[in-house]
From Swiss-Prot:
Highest taxon, organism lineage: Eukaryota
Keyword flag Cell membrane: no
Organism field: Arabidopsis thaliana (Mouse-ear cress)
GO molecular function: serine-type endopeptidase activity
Protein name: Subtilisin-like protease SBT3.13
Sites where a glycan is attached: N195, N223, N254, N389, N641
Sequence ranges assigned to domain Inhibitor I9 in this UniProt record: 41-119
Region forming the signal peptide: 1-21
Gene3D superfamilies for this protein: 2.60.40.2310, 3.50.30.30, Peptidase S8 propeptide/proteinase inhibitor I9, Peptidase S8/S53 domain
This enzyme's EC code(s): 3.4.21.-
Prosequence residues removed at maturation: 22-120
Top EC class of this enzyme: hydrolase
Length: 766
């Protein structure tokens, strides 16, 4: 790993760090024991395909394995997957020495071990302005705006890589849908309790599942004790059903969650078609019992490969690798998404759930659309009345009859002599043992994390530490403390307001600090959508889940509408439209705060461009577009060598000398991580609005920074000249090192305000 080729590959994969995985975050666990103690699954990545014929691609993989193993039969038995559509590569059972040997082959870019990843979930569309909406397909004439202009996304195809789908869900009905788009090349695969003819329809048009990677990881056979799932696309976990129907679920009226959040449930693009790619499985935990959703790299890569072939418009991948590390293996694990984007498919990824610390954001590659999570303007307040008539409010999902009991305090040091049976218990630590104690309810005081749960059937209320301390003070000053708890209600609109969720991962980007991440934010807290009836959080086929896993398909659904309206837009143009038109205040005009250890006003490292605004994104005026040439510039600026880039792209590529600056990558943002004195960078915009337009620059400089734009006016005169370039000079007046300060650059024609965030940190050289 010390030669220059391997070093540049490390950087290569660092840039290719991407989005595969689901916001409900994933921990990396090396796949253990394949078919025997000496072999395990490795992924051999070969870059772009050398043949258009998939059979020839697969044949070349067999030849490479046969040459390595010196046996045609051994090569056939070793091969797990052939990646033949979107890119070239294969997964195979190899010993470590065989993996090392094949990595030295001149056609091989890299060899990585299979990895196992662990899954970590009504009002949203009203909140974002995609309303009013009819209650059935019989009154579509009342639909206006983006939904009307796109026929509710009826020609869009949303691919979802996740834990599968529950095909009987009401949210997957195809009422009112016309024929499947002719460009669709995918299929529905039959399997356990999944009949392709019966369960697929004009809504669920694709259903594939990928078992080979996870089966090889657990010993080579499907073991029902370990993999507690269906050998088909049917969803035992529920996560995949939830994310798919957030993005493209059909209308389902009069839905609630135990009486909360009642209303019409629908996806962002209610008439879009859904293709489910099941690469995540319910696997028994190593410790503690129960199951987790696990997804292996080999299975995920094959899902990407097929999705590229099938013809999806957008890929929603609510999976993530946790906080990025400078690991070549971890970065290469995401390269499949690059090939999807290169072929025009927008890949939407989760920012992660390890927030609110800085540098935690996941899926940081510039070709990914990375989504943070916000709250809705909706809450579920629960009234807590102490025995002294003091009243407090906290959120919960408690919907039962009023609780009136004694009140006690427990902590991790409490002994079994404390009598809590039949009482409501106050705890400050979720690890405090209460199981088997017969408590009536739990009040869990905690720092804000925006996560609500039904706590396995025990009523639980979630006040913050301040209110928890008030309750504790009452307990300690009262001989026989009591409490009354009233069922939660649903409150929408003010005073509830939009916040970046405490769990949502934050920037700056730890891998490439000049690339702003996250890109955008969307609702991801207590989102009501369809779910598998096998999920313990399910009620009548629906559930409330939270996470960047949920905000990711919100954006995917919006992109399905945008691609219906603008089918020729590139993934970069789509991202630009979303980022430059986003709300930087809540839809009601209130400030957007960022939850965390200390609440503050949200900035670009919390929410990127802001809260997604679907209607404005449909008509952005200008876009900051990017293509393969721009991604080559990024790879060159990140230090990739020519041969590595050439293999990834499938054609000979030479980096310019001197290498380009990462500051000049044509992103809809400007991030300068180390400004010493001054720097000049460039951006290019494409007019997608009226042919004859005049835009003027409006500058909001970060504190202590002077921004100068040249020219200050952009004049578009004809359809032949829709692309113009401008420069931005940033000059610091700070005399000491600083943290980041934030501003913005807006191009305005009086109708469109095209806003990009600006983030600058001054670094004084010694």
């Amino acid at each position: 790993m010390n030669n220059s080729l391997q070093s540049s590959k490390l950087v290569l994969l660092l840039a290719i760090a991407l989005v595969l995985f689901l916001n409900t975050e994933l921990d990396f666990l090396t796949a253990a024991g394949a078919l025997d103690s000496d072999s395990k699954v490795y992924i051999v990545y070969l870059g772009e395909r050398e043949h258009d014929d998939p059979e020839l691609v697969t044949a070349s993989h067999h030849q490479m394995l046969e040459s390595l193993l010196q046996s045609k039969e051994d090569a056939q038995n070793s091969l797990i997957y052939s990646y033949q559509h979107g890119f070239s590569g294969f997964a195979a059972l190899l010993t470590s020495s065989q993996a090392k040997k094949i990595s030295e082959h001149p056609e091989v870019i890299h060899v990585i071990p299979n990895r196992i990843r662990k899954l970590k979930t009504t009002r949203a569309w009203d909140h974002l302005g995609l309303s009013p909406i009819p209650t059935s397909f019989s009154s579509l004439s009342s639909v206006k705006g983006l939904l009307h202009d796109t026929n509710l996304g009826s020609e869009a195809i949303i691919g979802v890589i996740d834990s599968g789908i529950w095909p009987e869900s009401k949210a997957v009905n195809d009422q009112g849908l016309g024929p499947i788009p002719k460009r669709w090349r995918g299929k529905c695969e039959p399997g356990e309790q999944f009949n392709a003819t019966i369960h697929c329809n004009n809504k669920l048009i694709g259903a594939r599942y990928y078992l080979n990677g996870v089966v090889a990881a657990i010993g080579g056979k499907f073991n029902r004790t370990i993999i507690q799932d269906f050998q088909s696309t049917r969803d035992a976990n529920g996560h995949g059903t939830h994310t798919a129907t957030i993005a493209g679920g059909s209308f389902v009226p009069n839905v609630s969650y135990f009486g909360l959040a009642q209303g019409l449930v629908r996806g962002g693009a209610p008439r879009a078609r859904i293709a489910s790619y099941k690469a995540c499985w319910n696997v028994m935990r190593d410790e503690g019992g129960g199951t987790d959703g696990r997804c292996t790299s080999a299975d995920m890569w094959k899902a990407f490969d097929d999705a590229i072939h099938d013809g999806v418009d957008v890929l929603s991948v609510s999976i993530g690798g946790g906080i990025p590390e400078d690991s070549e293996v971890d970065k290469l694990d995401y390269i499949a998404a690059f090939h999807a984007v290169a072929k025009g498919i927008t890949v939407v990824a989760a920012a992660g759930n390890e927030g609110p610390g800085a540098h935690t954001v996941d899926n940081v590659a510039p070709w990914l659309l990375t989504v943070a999570a916000t709250t809705l303007d909706r809450s579920f307040p629960t009234k807590i009345t102490l025995g002294n008539n003091q009243t407090l409010f906290a959120e919960s999902l408690f919907t039962g009859p009023e609780i009136s009991t004694g009140l006690a305090f427990l902590d991790s040091d409490s002994d079994d002599t404390v009598d809590v049976k039949g009482k409501t218990v106050l705890v400050f630590d979720s690890a405090t043992p209460i199981a088997g104690k017969g408590v009536a309810a739990v009040i869990l005081a905690q720092k804000p994390d925006d996560l609500l749960s039904r706590c396995n059937g025990v009523p639980c209320i979630f006040p913050d530490y301040e209110f928890g301390t008030e309750i504790l003070k009452y307990i300690r000053t009262t001989r026989s403390p009591t409490v009354r708890i009233t069922a939660a209600t649903t409150l929408t609109g003010q005073p509830a307001t939009t916040k970046v969720a405490a769990f949502s991962c934050r920037g700056p980007n730890s891998v490439s600090p000049a690339i702003l991440k996250p890109d955008i934010a969307a609702p991801g807290v207590s989102i009501l959508a369809a779910i598998s009836p096998l999920n313990p959080e399910e009620q009548n086929g629906f559930g409330l889940l939270s996470g960047t896993s949920m905000s990711t398909p919100v954006v995917s659904g919006i992109i399905a509408l945008l691609k219906s309206l603008h089918p020729k837009w590139s993934p970069a143009a789509v991202r630009s439209a979303l980022v430059t038109t986003a709300w930087r205040t809540s839809p009601s005009g209130e400030p957007i705060f960022a939850e965390g250890s200390n609440k503050k006003l949200a900035d670009p490292f919390d929410y990127g461009g802001g809260l997604v605004n679907p209607e404005k994104a449909a008509k952005p005026g200008l876009v900051y577009d990017m293509g393969i040439v721009d991604y080559i510039k990024y790879m060159c600026s990140a230090g990739y060598n020519d041969s590595s880039i050439s293999r990834v792209l499938g054609k000979k590529t030479n980096c310019p000398i001197p290498k380009p600056s990462m500051l000049d990558i044509n992103l809809p943002s400007i991030t300068i991580p180390n400004l010493e004195k001054e720097v000049t960078l460039t951006r290019t915009v494409t007019n997608v609005g009226p042919i004859k337009s005049v835009y003027r620059a409006v500058i909001e400089s970060p504190l202590g920074i002077t921004l100068t734009v040249n020219p200050t006016t952009l004049v578009f005169k004809s359809a032949a000249k829709r692309v113009l370039t401008f420069s931005v000079k940033a000059k610091t007046s700070h005399k000491v090192n600083t943290g980041y300060f934030f501003g913005s650059l807006t191009w305005s024609d009086g109708v469109h305000d095209v806003i990009i965030p600006v983030s600058v940190k001054t670094t004084i050289s010694m």
